[in-house]
């Protein structure tokens, strides 16, 4: 009884079973494609480039040169709470994101790098709408977007070498509220899901 499954196939099963047991749930606030990954272990036909903005964006990036390969080096997976917290602290320790002026292009590069090196599908870095502070929808991500004070903007724009295409010189053109935003680390976001309190409507399907 059991046929061909009885001996040879059972060899790797304990490791697979353990991996399944340890698989963490997707963090609150990730997108539909990540929910697919959580439930099915793959992105299904319900999330394609035709009907999912994150899938369409990713497909477009694969045809563009961004300085590193876009295809993940590791298995594709949804962002988890623990991974978001760990990534936040890693970036804080390494520096470079804190106080950096936000632009969609910079966010895209960060998302692609994380997708390529860690395999996290890039539909997790979303924020509450403005005006004012934008809080991360993904619970565990400890970076919020904070409007830059006018004095700081003036100071940054004083330098003669400031490129007209630098995010600080675009005066919030990327932002629906026309605010210039910067990434700001806030460790409390690991314990307090502000976005869920402010916008419970975004989490109805979580």
From Swiss-Prot:
Keyword Secreted present in the record's keywords: the answer is yes
HAMAP family per record: NEF_HIV (MF_04078)
Task: Extract the GO molecular function terms from the UniProt entry.
Answer: ATPase binding; CD4 receptor binding; GTP binding; MHC class I protein binding; protein kinase binding; SH3 domain binding; signaling receptor binding; thioesterase binding
For site (Might play a role in AP-1 recruitment to the Nef-MHC-I complex), what residue positions does UniProt give?
20
Q: Where is this region: Mediates dimerization, Nef-PTE1 interaction?
A: 108-124
Q: State if Isomerase is listed as a keyword.
A: no
The residue numbers the entry assigns to motif Diacidic are 174-175
Where does this protein chiefly localize? Answer: host cell
Mind listing the GO biological process terms from this record?
A: negative regulation of glycoprotein biosynthetic process; regulation of calcium-mediated signaling; symbiont-mediated suppression of host antigen processing and presentation of peptide antigen via MHC class I; symbiont-mediated suppression of host antigen processing and presentation of peptide antigen via MHC class II; symbiont-mediated suppression of host apoptosis; symbiont-mediated suppression of host autophagy; symbiont-mediated suppression of host innate immune response; viral life cycle
**For the motif PxxP, what are the positions?**
72-75
Concerning its family, UniProt says:
Belongs to the lentivirus primate group Nef protein family.
Q: Which Pfam families match?
A: F-protein
What gene is it encoded by? nef
Task: Tell me how the protein is altered or processed after translation.
Answer: The virion-associated Nef proteins are cleaved by the viral protease to release the soluble C-terminal core protein. Nef is probably cleaved concomitantly with viral structural proteins on maturation of virus particles.
Q: Which cellular component terms (GO) are annotated to the entry?
A: extracellular region; host cell Golgi membrane; host cell plasma membrane; membrane; virion component
Q: Give the region (Binding to ATP6V1H) as residue ranges.
A: 148-180
Keywords linked to the UniProt accession: AIDS, Apoptosis, Early protein, Host cell membrane, Host Golgi apparatus, Host membrane, Host-virus interaction, Inhibition of host adaptive immune response by virus, Inhibition of host autophagy by virus, Inhibition of host MHC class I molecule presentation by virus, Inhibition of host MHC class II molecule presentation by virus, Lipoprotein, Membrane, Myristate, Phosphoprotein, Secreted, SH3-binding, Viral immunoevasion, Virion, Virulence
Q: What is known of its domains?
A: The N-terminal domain is composed of the N-myristoyl glycine and of a cluster of positively charged amino acids. It is required for inner plasma membrane targeting of Nef and virion incorporation, and thereby for infectivity. This domain is also involved in binding to TP53.
Location of region: SH3-binding: 69-78
User: What does the record note on quaternary structure?
Assistant: Monomer; cytosolic form. Homodimer; membrane bound form. Interacts with Nef associated p21-activated kinase (PAK2); this interaction activates PAK2. Associates with the Nef-MHC-I-AP1 complex; this complex is required for MHC-I internalization. Interacts (via C-terminus) with host PI3-kinase. Interacts with host PACS1; this interaction seems to be weak. Interacts with host PACS2. Interacts with host LCK and MAPK3; these interactions inhibit the kinase activity of the latter. Interacts with host ATP6V1H; this interaction may play a role in CD4 endocytosis.
Location of the region described as Acidic in the Swiss-Prot/TrEMBL record: 62-65
What's the name of the protein?
Protein Nef
Residues found modified as Phosphoserine: 6
Which InterPro entries does the record cross-reference, listed alphabetically?
A: HIV-1_Nef_anchor_sf (IPR027480), HIV-1_Nef_core_sf (IPR027481), HIV_Nef (IPR001558)
């Amino acid at each position: 009884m059991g046929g061909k499954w009885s001996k040879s196939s059972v060899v790797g099963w304990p490791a697979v079973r353990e991996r399944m047991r340890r698989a963490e749930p997707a963090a609150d606030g990730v997108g539909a494609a990540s929910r697919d990954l959580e439930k099915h272990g793959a992105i299904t036909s319900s999330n394609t480039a035709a009907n999912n903005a994150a899938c369409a964006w990713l497909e477009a990036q694969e045809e563009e040169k961004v300085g590193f390969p876009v295809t993940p080096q590791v298995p594709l997976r949804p962002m988890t709470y623990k991974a978001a917290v760990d990534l936040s602290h890693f970036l804080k320790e390494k520096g470079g994101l804190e106080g950096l002026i936000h632009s969609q292009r910079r966010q895209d590069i960060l998302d692609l790098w994380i997708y390529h090196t860690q395999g996290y599908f890039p539909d997790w870095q979303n924020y509450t709408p403005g005006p004012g502070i934008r809080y991360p929808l993904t619970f565990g991500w400890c970076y919020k977007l904070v409007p830059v004070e006018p004095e700081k903007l003036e100071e940054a724009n004083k330098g003669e070498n400031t490129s007209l295409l630098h995010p600080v010189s675009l005066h919030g053109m990327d932002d629906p509220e026309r605010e210039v935003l910067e990434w700001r680390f806030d460790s409390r976001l690991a314990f307090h899901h502000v976005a869920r309190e402010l916008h419970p409507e975004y989490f109805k399907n979580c």
